[in-house]
């Protein structure tokens, strides 16, 4: 069977082995043990299940988040870098928050789109090719009733910018192996 095939191709596979039953884990919830609150300046990300236990400053821009089965717990450095730059943009264009169009391409859990809303932006679009991610975005949006609701749609990088759709600020916290082949629609998606 399978062991014979492995031994043929991998001479160092041990002859002795042990069978063990693997306990099924609730992967949808197991990650929660590792997700911690995070803040940068005014912006605060709080795991939904920690909401009652975390105090924030009075003027904090708070986003409650449960990534579920979508990418985007807010723990990755690139997500935090995007959030920091989002705040820099907000600070530099504070008088234009009502009219600035923000696009979160590959929005995952919606953490950056919801952060844009928490920071005062009003016109926000998030899209992701994964329908489950968009379901999570809508759920997170509902949990943040204090925020202006971003629009979330299922679309890949080509369709997300189809029809000439552009933003003043485009966030694309996506791996480079996806970004590089799709750089043309991303560049066209930024207003000149």
Where are these regions (language model features)?
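N-terminal auxiliary segments of SAM/dcSAM-dependent transferases
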Residues: 1-56
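A short helix-to-beta-strand connector/capping loop
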Residues: 12-15, 59, 146-150
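A short, charged helix-loop
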Residues: 57-67
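Conserved SAM/SAH cofactor-binding pocket of Class I
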Residues: 69, 73-158
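A short acidic, Gly/Pro-enriched loop at the edge of an enzyme's catalytic core
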Residues: 158-169
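A short SAM/SAH-binding and catalytic strip from SAM-dependent methyltransferases
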Residues: 169-181
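A short glycine-rich, Lys/Arg-flanked "PGG" loop and its adjoining helix->strand segment in the class I
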Residues: 183-191
